[in-house]
Every structure is written in structure tokens, then in C-alpha cells.
């Protein structure tokens, strides 16, 4: 107790220590030094950024694209320019001779091998999407991690490499999706990126801006960020895009400000914390979206699940999603590589905060929460495991026991089922492109009834001004209500598209995957038949449908919150359904815990 009291007193004077045990001033210096490294970049990286920051697509009037009622969610590519086909998988696929055939790195990677994605895997994936999906989707949600892991001590990552690769991947996404096509008369497909924990240096550590790092990211992503939001982005690396003007937006928020593995984050209660500022920004955006009768998808890299986020950050965000269930459709995230859903209980989060005196305490939130992600270490800047899956079956068993089983028990009370549905919001965690398992991504379909894409977007002047005031470090902090807590949803507002069938309600999805074992065999067979390497790759590489939301053994009528809550309950009762769910969670790779 004395030690904790001393820590609180030190924090009051700005001299606290982070959870790594290092002095807080040392952590801030480390962050500043990392930012300085990002400023000193190779001329090639600068050239990439200059290319990326050329003509702003938003400055030229263009015809609206016909809506298709579909969008793409893709995440965690982790391209590795050091990857060498045929080298040792045990050596991170970085050029060491393979010990035997089982240790030989395939051209497109090997599921569960632990290596990052070959550049060919990224390039062929995007080429496949361009051929088969690009003209059939309305927007792209792209949730981060665009650099390799720091999994090779002989070749540690540098800030320059991370910056260069982020710029390169951003260019590819822009040219594939958002750049004007059809003679510069037709709008491209909007792309909404978000920041991953491996997109920063050192990984996981990221402070509130403006910093050299946030400015560099703004330059790289300028073509994706609406011009009026770019100044605020330099503070919180968060923004939103009207993917359907005046009807639907995607909010990209920086989950690293809530992330337990960020040593600069302690909670979301103290005004000096980055998560506190981000919640103020998010609240203002949601308030304006409600005023305009718009709906939103939340998106970010790290999924908001307990112990993935700091306790107060998780509870506050879950409460916001509950009180804004008329606005928020759901959340789209990456990071964990496991294809699954997590129902966030907003009412439970609200009760937890109220029990703690409306979150005004400065003590660390030590509430026991289920589902520690098990994978991240605050202190280890070196990520020795890389893409290797670890204890994922154990994670799924805990998801079953700690989350899905209590839902099933709650649904036993037939009289309270409707209330049980509305208390939840859905956290959708996506499969990744990196071959932690097999590469995968998802195409969502949604209701287009009554939606017109030809509406001109209205200006966001009031909201932008408000956001700048919130994030300004010079703004005088006034005492008053805690605005990181949401207001109660007005009773006259019905629940939104995530809960009640209406325009923009998600109705089905298709999960695509690349079976790497099959692809690598076909590639070898094509080479043996005398084809060139590129001809063999073109013939062998493909994505195919792994499953859809309508497939047995647990077909879903639609993708409302109630459908997911019912599915969580069904999975606890039907052994066949659960086994299929776990197999799909690991992207049909056959993964088992060692």
C-alpha cells in the first residue's frame, strides 16, 4: 500500500514510473528518441512519401460510384522484404539454409511457421482482390500492422524500415482502391486505415501527439484522411471517413492509447493519459453522428476486449458503444489473427465504472477480467515469436467458458432476452493475411434499402473545431462532468442497424482464405511441368471461400447483435458447431496447441 501511495504521489508530480518499472521520464525520452529516428529517413522513404502525398483525390469533383452493398475488411499483412523463398523457416525465413524439406520456406509462406508474410503474398493477395473484388465493394477497412515483426536479433527493425514499408503499402492500397479510375471521372473506393502496434517504433509504444511520428504518419496517410481532419490527426492519430455521404462513416481510432502493452498508458481516467483525450474526441464524433442521423462502424487494430485494454479504457469504450447503440453498428479489428467475435457487455461495463466512483480514482484498475490475450509483453521490445501462434486453443477455451457460457445462462431467462440483446455490442476480430494460420479476409454485405450515394457531404466545421479544442495541450481544463463517460441514450431513439433490421444493417459475410499448403504444392507441380516461376505462381495462387455466415452447422439468419448472442449460446450447447467454429477461427490450418 505504501509503495502504491508513493507511486500515486510521484504521478501527481509528473515523476511516476511506467508498468515496466522504468521511470516515466525515461519512457517519454525513449518515445521522443523514437520519433527523432523516424525523422531521419532514407531518401527512398522520403520519395515514397512524396509520391503518396501527391494530388489529393478529394480536391477533384467526381461522379459517385454505384453502391454494391459490400465492403472489405483486411488486416495484419506484415510484409517482410527480408523473406527468402527456400530458406530456413526456423531462421525467420531470412536466408539461412533450410535443414530439410519441412524447414524450407514456401514462396507464399507457410501457415503456422512463424515467419512474416513474403512480399509475394502481399502482392498476389492485392492482385487477387483487384481482379475479383475491387469493383464489387463500396469501401475498405484496413486495420494495420504493415511492417514485419522484430523477430530476428541479427537484423533488428529500424524506424526507417517501418516508415518505408508503411509508405509502400499505403501507396499500393491507394493505387488499387482509392485512386480515380475510368478517365479520372469516377470516384475510387474509400480506404480507412488504422495504426497497428507494429507500425510504430519501438513496437507498442506510442504517445499522444503532435510528435515527429504522428506527423510522419499524417504525411503517409494524407490521401486517406479528410483534409479538415489532418491537424487533429497529428494529435490522436484517429479520424473518420464518410464512406457513404451523410449516411455511413467509418471511425478509425488509435487503439494503442487504450492498449495495456503500451508502457505510456496507465488508464483512461487521468487527464494526462492519451486514452482520456481519445475518449473525449470519440464522444464528440459520436455526438455529431447522432445529430446528423448517421451510422458508424468503429475500426482499429487492437480489439477492445478485457485485459487487452486497460480496465478503465475497456469499460468506458464498452459503455459508449452501449449508449450509442442507435449509431454504432459494430467494431472491426485485427491484431489477434484468430477469426472470432466477442460480445462486449456495455451494461456490465457501466456498472463496473459506477462501482468505482464514476472512474475518478487515479489508482490502476486491477479488476479481474477474463481473456488476457496472453501474447504481448510490456517490457519486451523484441518480439521473438513473430507470427508463431501460441496457446490459441487455450484462448478459445477461455472465450467459451468466460464469455459465451455466461451469455447462454443469461438467455435462459426468456423474459429478459430482449434486454440481454441490447446490452451487447459486437467486436469482430478478423483473420490476418500474415500466415500465422492461413491468410484470410472478409467481405461484408449490408442492406442498401433507401440509400443514395449521390448526396453531397456536408461540412464538418463545428466538429473539427471542437476536436481541435479537445486535443489542444494549451486548452484550459475546466472542472465539470466527466466527458469521457457517455450520456444516457435518449428513450425516443430506437436501436440502430446493428440491432434492428434497417438500411445499413449487415446481412451476411463471405470469408476468403488462401490454403498455403495446397498453393505451395500446386506451385511446385507447375515448376516441375516446366513453367517459369512467375507462370507457376500465377497458376497456383488463389483465394477461395472458406465459409459464409449462412453455412452449416450454425447458419445465421442475419448479422444483428441478437444473432451473434444467440450463436454464442448455441456454441456452448452444440459440440459439432463449436469444433467447426474453432477450425474456422484458425483459418482451416489444422492448428493445435503444442
From Swiss-Prot:
Cytoplasmic topological segments: 1-24
Span list, region Disordered: 1-20, 475-497
GO CC term, one of those recorded: fungal-type vacuole
GO BP annotations listed: polyphosphate catabolic process
Pfam families from the UniProt entry: Metallophos (PF00149)
EC number: 3.6.1.10
Primary site of residence: membrane
GO molecular function ontology, one term from the record: endopolyphosphatase activity
Protein name: Endopolyphosphatase
Amino acid at each position: 500500500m505504501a509503495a502504491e501511495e508513493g507511486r500515486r504521489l510521484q504521478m501527481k508530480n509528473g515523476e511516476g514510473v511506467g508498468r515496466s518499472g522504468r521511470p516515466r521520464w525515461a519512457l517519454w525520452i525513449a518515445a521522443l528518441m523514437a520519433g527523432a529516428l523516424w525523422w531521419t529517413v532514407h531518401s527512398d522513404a522520403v520519395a515514397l512519401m512524396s509520391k503518396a502525398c501527391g494530388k489529393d483525390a478529394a480536391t477533384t469533383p467526381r461522379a459517385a460510384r454505384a453502391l454494391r452493398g459490400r465492403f472489405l475488411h483486411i488486416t495484419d499483412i506484415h510484409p517482410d522484404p527480408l523473406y527468402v523463398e527456400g530458406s530456413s523457416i526456423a531462421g525467420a525465413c531470412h536466408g539461412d539454409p533450410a535443414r530439410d524439406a519441412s524447414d524450407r520456406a514456401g514462396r507464399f509462406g507457410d501457415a503456422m511457421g512463424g515467419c512474416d508474410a513474403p512480399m509475394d503474398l502481399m502482392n498476389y493477395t492485392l492482385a487477387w482482390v483487384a481482379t475479383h473484388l475491387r469493383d464489387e465493394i463500396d469501401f475498405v477497412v484496413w486495420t494495420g500492422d504493415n511492417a514485419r515483426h522484430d523477430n530476428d536479433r541479427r537484423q533488428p527493425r529500424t524506424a526507417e524500415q517501418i516508415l518505408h514499408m508503411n509508405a509502400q503499402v499505403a501507396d499500393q492500397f491507394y493505387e488499387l482502391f482509392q485512386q480515380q479510375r475510368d478517365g479520372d471521372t469516377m470516384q475510387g473506393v474509400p480506404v480507412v486505415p488504422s495504426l497497428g502496434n507494429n507500425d510504430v517504433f519501438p513496437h507498442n509504444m506510442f504517445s499522444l501527439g503532435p510528435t515527429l511520428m504522428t506527423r510522419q504518419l499524417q504525411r503517409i496517410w494524407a490521401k486517406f484522411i479528410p483534409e479538415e481532419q489532418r491537424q487533429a490527426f497529428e494529435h490522436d492519430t484517429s479520424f473518420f471517413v464518410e464512406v457513404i455521404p451523410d449516411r455511413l462513416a467509418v471511425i478509425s481510432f488509435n487503439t494503442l492509447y487504450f492498449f495495456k502493452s503500451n508502457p505510456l498508458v496507465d488508464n483512461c481516467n487521468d487527464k494526462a493519459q492519451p486514452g482520456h483525450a481519445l475518449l473525449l474526441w470519440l464522444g464528440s464524433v459520436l455526438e455529431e453522428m447522432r445529430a446528423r442521423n448517421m451510422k458508424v462502424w468503429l475500426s482499429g487494430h487492437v480489439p477492445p476486449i478485457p485485459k487487452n485494454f486497460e480496465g478503465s479504457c475497456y469499460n468506458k469504450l464498452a459503455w459508449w458503444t452501449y449508449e450509442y447503440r442507435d449509431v454504432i453498428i459494430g467494431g472491426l479489428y485485427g491484431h489477434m489473427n484468430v477469426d472470432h467475435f466477442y460480445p462486449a457487455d456495455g451494461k456490465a461495463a457501466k456498472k463496473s465504472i459506477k462501482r468505482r466512483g464514476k472512474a475518478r480514482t487515479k489508482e490502476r484498475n486491477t479488476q479481474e477480467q477474463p481473456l488476457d490475450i496472453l501474447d504481448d509483453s510490456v517490457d519486451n521490445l523484441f518480439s521473438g515469436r513473430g507470427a508463431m501462434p501460441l496457446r490459441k486453443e487455450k484462448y478459445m477455451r477461455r472465450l467459451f467458458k468466460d464469455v459465451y457460457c455466461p451469455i447462454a445462462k443469461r438467455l435462459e431467462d426468456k423474459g429478459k432476452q430482449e434486454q440481454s440483446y441490447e446490452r451487447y455490442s459486437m467486436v469482430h476480430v478478423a483473420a490476418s493475411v500474415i500466415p500465422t494460420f492461413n491468410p484470410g479476409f472478409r467481405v461484408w454485405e449490408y442492406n442498401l434499402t433507401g440509400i443514395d450515394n449521390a448526396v453531397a457531404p456536408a461540412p464538418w466545421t463545428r466538429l473539427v473545431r471542437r476536436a481541435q479544442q479537445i486535443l489542444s495541450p494549451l486548452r484550459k481544463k475546466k472542472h465539470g462532468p466527466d466527458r469521457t463517460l457517455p450520456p444516457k441514450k435518449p428513450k425516443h431513439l430506437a436501436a440502430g442497424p446493428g440491432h434492428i433490421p434497417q438500411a445499413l444493417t449487415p446481412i451476411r459475410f463471405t470469408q476468403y482464405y488462401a490454403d498455403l499448403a495446397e498453393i505451395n504444392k500446386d506451385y511446385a507441380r507447375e515448376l516441375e511441368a516446366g513453367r517459369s516461376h512467375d507462370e507457376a505462381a500465377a497458376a497456383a495462387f488463389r483465394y477461395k471461400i472458406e465459409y459464409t455466415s449462412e453455412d452449416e452447422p450454425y447458419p445465421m439468419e442475419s448479422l444483428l447483435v441478437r444473432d451473434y448472442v444467440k450463436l454464442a449460446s448455441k456454441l456452448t450447447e452444440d459440440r459439432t458447431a463449436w469444433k467447426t467454429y474453432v477450425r474456422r477461427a484458425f483459418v482451416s490450418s489444422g492448428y493445435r496447441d503444442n
